[in-house]
From Swiss-Prot:
Highest taxon listed in the record's lineage: Bacteria
GO biological process, one term: phospholipid biosynthetic process
Encoding gene (name): plsX
Full protein name: Phosphate acyltransferase
Function: Catalyzes the reversible formation of acyl-phosphate (acyl-PO(4)) from acyl-[acyl-carrier-protein] (acyl-ACP). This enzyme utilizes acyl-ACP as fatty acyl donor, but not acyl-CoA.
Amino acid sequence: MKILLDTLGSDKGASELIEGAIMALEKKDFNLTIVGNEEENRNIVNKRFEEKIDFVNATETIENNESPTKAIRSKKDSSMRKCFDLLNEDYDGFLSTGSTGALLTGATLITKRLDNVSRPCLMVTVPSLKGEVVVLDVGANVDVTSDLLEQFAKMGYVYSKNILGKEDCKVGLLNIGVEEHKGDSLRLETYQKLSNYPYFKGNVEARDVLKGDFDVVVTDGFSGNILLKTIEGSVEFIKTLAKSKLSKLDEKSQQIIIPMIKSMSSGIDYNSVGSAPFLGTKKPVFKAHGSSNRNAIMSGILTLIKFIEEDVTDKLKKELTNE
């Protein structure tokens, strides 16, 4: 198995990404190609896993403030563009911490979409009282149609069933109420289309997502991104509030409560989640948070490898053609 790692565009620099990849190599047998500043990257690796690691030099970086389409097309010596070009050859998957917009553009224009996929979507998993919940889209597609949301539901179902092991997967539509007649015209139209699938169980409100009654929550990228950021912000608020209250407790009480708070908040930390796939592409393209630490990169690569081993792309293809 051959994995590509884009080392340009990370907030923490190439070293943190490469150390995370080394940690993944210690846990799993695969071949890694590191794309970026070759001289710097070779120095960081320092001959570890020599038989498993290759290097490709890149002199350009795609920045977050650039036009994604223009950057992907014009910056042919950027690490991200080189990863996309290599992925189209004989590589199995690709992980980057770079621009979400550029990754979506590259996934669409270079890697290409699966048949019957109008646009790839970005998904994440969030913790709940009953295990992990798939949420999609979370930022790739702000403007969507009911047909797109129907595709997202199918792809989320396949991911949840095959990667998370949810055999009796339940899919819900994010809405302002649980009743069938609630929501705008997009939600009403989508509800009718999703009702044709046995795994669709109705609407779900944002406040109920973390209860875990639904294994997959489908929404547009605008609402999904707000939901995700609200969850992240709420966790940070609770952690900050708890710290201020804990400082007033005695040391013994702190020793009991602090581990509980850390355990509760760890699941929503992007460093423990790792990475998120763009579902609907012909080969796996995974996005990690720009501030990901080495543990996140390790987790992200291992998730990417599992995605490949479980042949999720082929299973998505079959689900999307089963009209």
